[in-house]
Each structure stands twice: as C-alpha cells, then as structure tokens.
Amino acid sequence: MKRVSALILALMFLFLASCGTDTAPETTTEQANSASTDLKFDYETVKVPFKSVSSPLLLDGKLVMAVATADRTETDRRYLISYDIGSGKYDNIFESTHELGDIQSIRFDGKWLIWNDCEIYNSARNIYCMNYKTKEITQITKLGNDSAVGEPCISDGVVFWDECFDIGGENTRSRIKAYDCTTKETKTISEGGDKVCAGDGKAAFTVNKGGKTTLGVYDIESGKVTELALGDGSYTLKDCAAGYALYVETKDPSRGDSSQKTWIIDLSDGKTAVADIFPDGAKLFGDYAVSCTATALWFYKRDGGMLSLIDGLRDTNVADASFAGNNTVISVIKNVGSGTSEGLVNETEMHIFDLNKLSV
C-alpha cells in the first residue's frame, strides 16, 4: 500500500511539474571571494534562460533588461522584458523595430524607464521612454540616416542625449538635447558636446572649444548651464550622480602619451580630486562607485569628493556590471558556452550585490 501511495504522489508531482512553460530560476546566495578579511560581500546568483543580457535593473523584485532569446543570436538583444525572479515568468515590454536589433542603455529615475533601440550593423538608433506605472511608451527621437544619438540618461523626468547630425557631410556637428517626459517637449541645451550623464537634478557633458575641454553642467530646475574648465588633454566623461561626475583624462595621445588618470569633480564649484578608480566601466551612484575588469569588480565608498577602495572582488568572466538602483550592482557573467564547440547556451548568469547589506 505504501508503494502505491508513493507511486501516486510521484506521478502527481511529475504532472504538476509539467504544467506551464515557466519555471522558477535557479537562485543561490554566495559570499564573494574577497581580498579583505573584514568585509563580507554576499551576493545572489540568478540564472536566466537567455543567451545574453544587457543593462539589467532590479525593480520591485523583477529584472528589467534587454535579452536575446533562444531563437536569436547572442548580439540580437531585441526584447526588453520584465522578469520575475521568484517565478521565472516574464512580460515583454518592447520589441526592437529593427530586423537585427540591440536594446541598450536602460535607465530608470523612479517613474520613467528609458532605452535606446539600436540596429546592430548600422547607426540607426532611437530613444524611447515609458511611464513605468501606466506602461505608456513614447518614441522620443525619430532620426534619419544622417543623424545618430549617443547613450541616453535621465534625471527628474528629463532625458538627455548627445546627437550628431549631418553625418558624412561637410559640416558634421553635435549638440546636447533634453526631452521632458511630462510635457513631451524637446530642446537643445548646448550646441556642441559629447557624452552626457545625468543624476540628482543635473546633467554633465564635455565640450571642446579651441583645443580646450570644458565640462558643461545643466541644472534641470533653473535651466541654466555653467561651464567648468578641465584642460587641454583628452577627456571622457564616465558618470554623474549626487552632485559629482567621474571623468578620465588621457594626457596627449597625438604625442604618444596615452597615460590615463581618473578624476572626480564637484559640479557645484569645480573642485577636483584624483579618483583612484579603474576607468573601465566606472559608474558613480549615491555614496558608492564601481568599476569592472574581465575578472573582477571593484567597489568604492564616496565621502564628498573623495573615493576610497572598499574591496576588489574576483568575479570570473565579467561581461558587464551596471548600477541596478538602490545601491545595488548587477554583474553579468559571460555565457558559459562562449568559445566552446557547443557554442552559446540558452542561459545567462548574473550576480546581484546589495551594498545596503554590506557587513563588516
């Protein structure tokens, strides 16, 4: 009788397991292999059924990210989805309008979600925003083949991007644009300008004038732009948050000096300090900063205009690391099938670091 009961229970289990195509993802909690004996970095591992993932955010227990599904190549991350970590179910938010699409630069400011819909083998790309509560989607840019946009960013309901136009012509130019998600109005805040970053009510961008580089700082509330002098080197803006910006200075590549130094600048008064931070993938958020290499993540604590290294954590085969909101960082691990005879498998692993739970 016991054997019959056990058999019936086993059959019921198999039947229930076969109902539905969604299964809960594999999640584990592990402690990072830290170089410090005092700090404990516990992170959550989540494995999701996609060939590749980009720009993941963590919103209310769901991963909002761009993914390449089993029927696409690993670079064709054409679906923007909301993935429930607990159940493994997901909803499609947006599908790329391109035959070979790649959704990039997903950002969220607490109300508005934005992204860049890019064509893999062309410069065609357009920016979209969505009211996360109502799910209403608006296409912000509608550019032709002679124009291109850079990575968008958002703060306080205003989207910023650098736009290059008259590409291929005799007068190729760039400008910094801003779009108000509430009023749906677009305006130019700077004629000329490169990479733009935004956070906490401000946007920062670099402008080259006569061989000198300045940092433009746009205040969303006042609508005014102030300029901070940087120098005559080559400068790359990395990120902007909490009234500060990170940028990388490359001395003089034209003269063979490609040495680099990372700086942090106070956007209110222009005071700078050397930021002892790896420039690769450097991101600034709240009281922290993070950068990544192919085999490690580096976490930093910000105290005013100073950054100090918390720890470097070995995290093998890091493809990317992004700020996911609320002092959370997500590292995306390279697909386990990369470089093997079997090729890419339909699974991507991510590590979720919650710095709010950092213990000493």
Per-region residue spans from a language model:
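C-terminal motif of bacterial Sec signal peptides marking the signal peptidase cleavage site
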Residues: 15-18
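Bacterial signal peptide processing site
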Residues: 20-22
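A short helix->beta-strand "capping" segment at the edge of beta-propeller domains
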Residues: 30-52
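A short beta-strand motif characteristic of beta-propeller blades
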Residues: 41-48, 89-96, 136-143, 184-190, ...
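Repeated scaffold domains used in trafficking and secretory/extracellular systems
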Residues: 50-60, 100-110, 146-156, 190-201, ...
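Residue position within the beta-strands of beta-propeller blades
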Residues: 64-68, 113-116, 159-162, 203-206, ...
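Structural motif
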Residues: 71-81, 117, 121-129, 167-177, ...
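Short loop/turn segments that connect beta-strands within beta-propeller blades
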Residues: 84-88, 131-135, 179-184, 219-223, ...
